[in-house]
Amino acid sequence: MTGVQTCALPISGHACTSRGVLGIGVPQATAIADAAGARIRHLDETGVYVHVIADGGMRTGGDVAKAIACGADAVMIGSPLAAAYEAPGRGYHWGMATFHPTLPRGARVKAGNRATLAEILVGPAHENDGTLNLFGALRTSMATTGYETLKEFQKAEVMIAPALQTEGKSLQRAQGIGMGQ
């Protein structure tokens, strides 16, 4: 495509240890929003649209929705796909960023076998932890916030609220269910 470029934005994947080892890094939402802002400036200056692809730690449909709302055009979901029964890694995910002495592609992380590829992507979900039916979760997030298209959703006003990760989860944690696992 003329006038379109793609740029992957690696943040910190499931198998990546760089942030912990080096003690540096940029939080996912900030990095995506900054890249999306730079994309707009680049488009204004050159007329070339650069796709932002968020890569790093995408586990749930909520993670995917947040990445899109922050401005990503697409996300990489290595670990969720590796957990599909059909995945060639048989429940393992190989990270690209982390060195490993015997594996040419980085660290090998156990993703487990959770569900079929169809269940992971489009459901039905047989667990309520957000790791199944990723597309359904994205659609529900968009509908709940009043957006009909991905392009509209990319322009959503985003508020960072760390309490959302723990608020109202005490019963789930106590019972080891849902997002409290």
Positions of predicted regions on the chain:
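Gly-rich Lys/Arg/Thr-decorated short loops/hinges at beta-loop-alpha junctions or inter-strand turns
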Residues: P10-G20
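Short, small-residue-biased leader/transition segments that mark boundaries at the very start
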Residues: T2-L9
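Alpha/beta catalytic cores of nucleotide-metabolism and tRNA/nucleoside-modifying enzymes
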Residues: M1, L22-A54, R59-Q181
